[in-house]
Amino acid sequence: AVRALDWLRPRQVLDVAGDWITRRPDVRPGGWAFQYANPHYPDLDDTAVVVMAMDRARRAGAGARYDVAIDRGVEWIKGMQSRNGGWAAFDVDNVLHYLNNIPFADHGALIDPPTEDVTARCVSMLAQLGETVDDSEALSRGVAYLRETQLADGSWYGRWGLNYIYGTWATLC
């Protein structure tokens, strides 16, 4: 695992500000992109999972070698939380649904609203790092978002896995 994390560490985007900087000009870059060599579009859920893996390695004896990367990833994720408490994949507060009615928006992906599955991974990361709803505004707001978006049947929708099983297991984990 350490070899893989050592491969991931230098791929953290620390000096390129993508589109997200428009809404969060005071937030420093600190995420990882799901695509190789795409520093303009780091994403929040992959960043959360990389941070969790680095934290697990740290607890398993890797020492402080990942501390700076973890701290910067957490800083970026917290800075990217949307007003409603959730997190989106790549952006923040990008919720102008009318944009999906533009004729060339045939797949309805011109916006990047907060989603349950991405929010769940960010919440999981914060909890794994020892934050609680009592001492972390970001975690408290994220949990509130998940409570608000749970459906009457108990499930959550997963945008990126495109089904309710995906969204529900992501939230429960």
Question: What are the functions of these language-model segments?
Answer:
Residues 1-173:
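Preference for long, amphipathic alpha-helical scaffolds in soluble/luminal domains
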